[in-house]
A protein has these predicted regions:
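Non-catalytic interaction-recognition regions
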Residues: 1-93, 108-597
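Short, charged, solvent-exposed linker or helix-capping segments at domain edges/interfaces
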Residues: 94-99
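A common structural junction motif
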Residues: 103-107
């Protein structure tokens, strides 16, 4: 289906051409004065300069040609030369029925040429718990992935774990100090290693920060960790077996935590998976003359003549031969081109890492790791801050674990749901359902609270505001969906058959209903724009507008008590469409709605 605004523009453009003016002046936009009209065209203002006449003479001519067009209720020429457009309610009702008949797509066409897109979530380091700093990459990445999938693309989400480098040597060294008799440290051992890990997730989460602290104050400990890292990367059997245990224990725990966030990955690869590609990649860069030595390090120059700021060389190997994040990211691209051959690779990472990605992307293009046809995108996100405007912390100033934050919001939502239950005596929700509902609504509060902000901007994480059932919040959106579900259930309880409602939506009978239809009609344009700009906040803004439009219609209209049966069916059919569009949108944002609240 064509976007409504495009259909309107086509009609207005035809009128401009018929009146003897260039088609470029027929572009229509949403009205910036919704109290006067629904759409507007300002083309006559620009055309007046070219055709050397008063703008209103042009707009008068065009309006006269559109007077009898069945698409419009009215097209008014307003001085000095604007066209104010109102949609015909019968045309709008047909557009609604066409959307409803287009099951699961609602007028949004799938991509004609599906792309293969890899989304790199810039995942956490293994052996460390997820903390609030991991929230944005997970939440934004999941939504970007779901939007692209809904558009019809083949999307592969990769957690991209930090499982390489000194941190692994630190863990091995600290474990050796704690449990020196483990068989993994016996170089002469040639047998099978135990299948059971010699540590639990809670032990592992204590080992890493302890080791990290020691390495900063104890030089001999740091030396031992560097040696362990080198031996691990050199293939020492016992250390390789320990790495396998670290990964298994960590990933099991990470999967549980990501599951609670409703975030899922097609690939659970780490930096270590790209390491086999490093030697060949480095050799290629040397042989082809891309890489050269500079101050002891191997680098690739990536500055360009058009640069307005200094872009340092991309370091491939440090002076001691060790690789860096840039090395790993480039080798990961080599691996992805070989295994997935993507048309686009999207990286989710803090906006402060933008220089790193400029260097890596330029190096990848210059050295031929990726062809010109593969798009490389960095979605740089802002910081999640507390009410004091500083990065979000625990009350004692520490970094808050993500599961503790989610638990805090779950508890807050559970209290609100129980309060709601007391106010509504007929709402009998047992403890188990109340807890599950609280989890569902809490997740919406967190995700919507994040995604409703433009990704690149910092935002204040305000639990009180995010968990409110009023205003631009996740719980408000869910409350609207639950309200619609309740009306539909009552309709069916009285013998109504929702599945039999086909082409039942009739022309709007009041302003609230027409406003709801106009909001629904923006669905395909909104999702297309959110995909093209990797901008989930556009979907949030849309569903907030849609929820407000529905609630306005609901308060203005007697739905279930409507005596005209055909009109009642029209209302119910419109509610079904509203519910389905809200549900498909929140699914793209990565959360769902309960049946009751």
């Amino acid at each position: 289906m064509k976007k409504l605004i495009n259909l309107i523009s086509e009609e207005v453009t035809k009128a401009f051409v018929s009146a003897g003016y260039d088609e470029k002046y027929g572009k229509v936009t949403l009205s910036n004065r919704p109290d006067l009209c629904e759409f507007q065209c300002n083309g006559a203002m620009a055309a007046a300069k070219e055709y050397k006449c008063a703008p209103f003479m042009i707009s008068d001519k065009v309006a006269a040609l559109l007077e009898s067009d069945e698409m419009f209720e009215s097209v008014e020429s307003v001085k000095p030369g604007f066209l104010n457009i109102k949609m015909d309610t019968a045309f709008l009702a047909k557009y609604m029925n066409d959307m409803k008949d287009d099951e699961g797509r609602y007028g949004l066409e799938k991509a004609k040429k599906p792309l293969t897109i890899v989304v790199d979530y810039g995942g956490p380091n293994v052996a460390k718990p997820l903390h609030v700093g991991h929230l944005r990459s997970a939440v934004i990445g999941e939504s970007v992935k779901r939007i692209a999938k809904f558009m019809g693309h083949n999307v592969i989400g990769d957690v991209h774990l930090g499982d390489w480098g000194l941190q692994m040597g630190l863990i091995i060294t600290e474990l050796r100090e704690r449990k020196p008799d483990l068989v993994y440290f016996d170089e002469s051992y040639t047998g099978e290693y135990p299948k059971e890990a010699p540590f639990t997730i809670s032990e592992l989460e204590d080992i890493y920060p302890t080791a990290s602290g020691k390495s900063k104050s104890d030089e001999s400990f740091k030396e031992a960790a560097l040696l362990a890292t080198k031996e691990l990367q050199g293939g020492r059997r016992g250390y390789q077996a320990l790495l396998s245990h670290i990964m298994n224990v960590s990933v099991t725990d990470l999967k549980r935590n990501y599951e609670n966030l409703n975030v899922h990955f097609e690939l659970w690869k780490g930096e270590s998976d790209a390491q086999p590609y490093v030697p060949g990649m480095v050799e290629m860069m040397k042989e082809k003359g891309f890489a050269h030595m500079s101050e002891g390090a191997l680098v690739v120059d990536v500055k360009e003549d058009t640069d307005t700021k200094e872009i340092p060389p991309c370091i491939i190997l440090k002076s001691d031969g060790a690789s860096l994040y840039s090395t790993t990211d480039l080798a990961t691209l080599v691996m992805r081109m070989k295994e997935n051959n993507p048309d686009r690779v999207i990286y989710l990472a803090d906006a402060r890492q933008s220089m790193h990605f400029i260097q890596v992307f330029r190096c990848a293009r210059k050295t031929g790791i990726v062809p010109d046809t593969t798009e490389l995108v960095h979605i740089g996100f802002g910081t999640m801050n507390g009410k004091d405007g500083k990065p979000f912390k625990t009350r004692d100033g520490g970094v808050m674990r993500l599961e503790y934050l989610l638990k805090e919001i779950d508890d807050e939502m559970l209290n609100k749901i129980k309060e709601n239950q007391k106010e509504k005596e007929n709402l009998n929700i047992d403890e188990a359902e109340a807890k599950q509902t609280a989890k569902t609504v809490a997740l919406a509060a967190v995700k919507y609270g994040d995604l409703s902000n433009q990704a690149s901007k910092d935002y204040i994480f305000d639990i009180d505001r995010f968990t409110s059932f009023e205003g631009n919040t996740g719980p408000y959106i869910l409350y609207t969906i639950v309200r619609i579900k309740s009306i539909l259930s009552k309709y069916e309880a009285k013998g109504g058959n929702i599945s039999a409602l086909k082409d039942a939506i009739m022309p709007a009978v009041n302003a609230g209903q027409k406003n709801l239809m106009l909001s629904l009609a923006k669905f395909n344009a909104t999702i297309e724009s959110a995909y093209e700009e990797s901008a989930p906040h556009k979907i949030c803004a849309y569903i907030y507008e849609l929820a407000n439009a529905f609630n306005g219609f609901y308060h203005d209209t007697k739905i279930l008590s409507e005596e005209n049966e055909e009109l009642k069916k029209s209302y119910i059919s419109l509610l079904v469409l509203t519910k389905e569009i809200l549900e498909v949108c929140i699914d793209m944002l990565g959360f769902s709605a309960p049946d009751r609240m």
